[in-house]
Amino acid sequence: MSRRIVCLRHGQTRWNVEHRFQGHTDIPLDETGIAQAARSASLLASLKPTKIVSSDLSRAHDTALALGRVTGLPVTVDKELRERGGGEWEGLTGDVMAARWPAEYAAFEPPGGETEVEVATRVSAAMLRWVEEIDDDGLLVVVSHGAALRLGMLAVLGLPRESWHTLGGLGNCSWSVLKQGRKGWRVGEHNAGTLPEPVSSDDKPEFQDDGTR
């Protein structure tokens, strides 16, 4: 066996439904999100995780706590696992962002926010730091956010910047599995869950099902 990382996205929030950029804004799970967290926890518990780490934002932390209750594991909080900072876009929908900042929206670079490279560097460093704390056959669960996890995984996998479009987004309470091998990390599963969940996150429109924010 080799080390594995389960990258679990948080459950649904009201702003997910409204297609608003959440970023660092602390929006809680809605009723659907709470149910999604409980459902994913019952499934992921069967994988016998050895450590759970989470973003400090409540939508991710509460999702992680649901898994912690089932497994009996504590949840460690790490601010480095936060979502991409959206700057002036936080709380806005894609239509508003595109109308006010057409050039920035086309490049998907939020004014006053983080770049993709900054997020990828931040999140991947946290993931790799935490995975070093588990045994060689251990399973780390990282509970975070849509854009943060996609970008972090791309950096962990070592994919070149021009190939970052090849990995799709994660639905609410869906997860991906990274496996460590002799030649590095590889994808074992992507966007897994009980049923496919619509993808609406703080990520580029092409990584969402409906092209909105």
Protein language model features and the residues they cover:
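General small-molecule cofactor/ligand-binding pocket signal
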Residues: 6, 76-78, 188
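Phosphate-coordination/substrate-recognition cap region in phosphate-metabolizing enzymes
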Residues: 39-100, 105
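Loop-to-helix element that buttresses phosphate recognition and phosphoryl-transfer chemistry
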Residues: 5-63, 112-125
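Short active-site segment of divalent metal-dependent hydrolases/proteases
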Residues: 13, 148-149
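Acidic, low-complexity terminal tails and accessory targeting/binding regions
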Residues: 1-3, 84-95, 132, 136-138, ...
